[in-house]
Amino acid sequence: MKAIILAGGKGTRGKPYTEYFPKAMNPINGKPMIDYVVRYLKSFNFIKEVIIISDYNGLGGQIKNYYGDRKDIKFIQDSQSGTGGDLLHIEKELKNESEFLLWFVDNLCAVDVKKMRETFKEKNSFACIATRTKRKEETGFAIVENGIIKKFKEKPIMKLQLSECLGIYMLRKEIIQKIKKKKQKQVNLSFDILQELSKEGKVSAHDIADKEWVDAESPMMLERNKKLVTKIIKQMGL
């Protein structure tokens, strides 16, 4: 199996930082965030190759410079036309594969990729998405009765009414043919492709359970969630 890391995008949410370096290079303990993702993926023996998609003609060149001439990582120029276009760029890289892992670089999580793969196969799904059903809130809550606060709850762990989808996917290679059939410049993987497949019962979910997750969009976000990031890296075994 090959793991594809999407490290392109304009990093709009991470501005002004992403005007100077890509979000993949957000620093964590002196190393870029993408390095933790790469090392974690390589800890699974069934992942034979890591491919990083980014704009190497722009800020993404910093990623390539960081890794230098490493032979165990392949660098593919992004399409500048969204996730769908990026996946079309790697079609030939998947020639001998039946499935692949897709990881958006700003997702930091010790999701058990082995168990996720088992879910993917057991459900005979076209796609499997990492999800979570609970999260720790960033603000305090209160129990209110008749306008009077009876009790405070400091940043509680809340059960979500709907499962939250994370940016980590396991996909059949045939997904690329479905993207081609759309014949449109911008293809949103979730809403243009997976939405249709979900109606056919072909999209499964892998709950990350007690594993933590953070959307690492900027250095500010990482700094604000420093304890959480440290916990995730420990869960990753790094």
Name every feature range the model reports, one short phrase each:
Residues 25, 142-144, 205:
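A structural signal for short hydrophobic beta-strand segments in well-ordered beta-sheet cores
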Residues 1-19, 202:
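N-terminal nucleotide-binding beta1-loop-alpha1 segment
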Residues 111-139:
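Conserved donor-nucleotide/metal-binding helix-loop-beta segment in metal-dependent transferases, i.e.
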Residues 47, 97, 124-125, 201:
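Short, high-confidence coil segments that cap the C-terminus of an alpha-helix
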Residues 127-129, 135-159:
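Anionic-ligand binding region
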Residues 101, 108, 117-121, 148-238:
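Catalytic-core segments of class I nucleotidyltransferases/pyrophosphorylases
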Residues 10, 105-107, 133:
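Active-site metal-binding loops of divalent metal-dependent hydrolases
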Residues 2-5, 13, 27, 31-104, ...:
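Conserved N-terminal catalytic core of the sugar/cofactor nucleotidyltransferase
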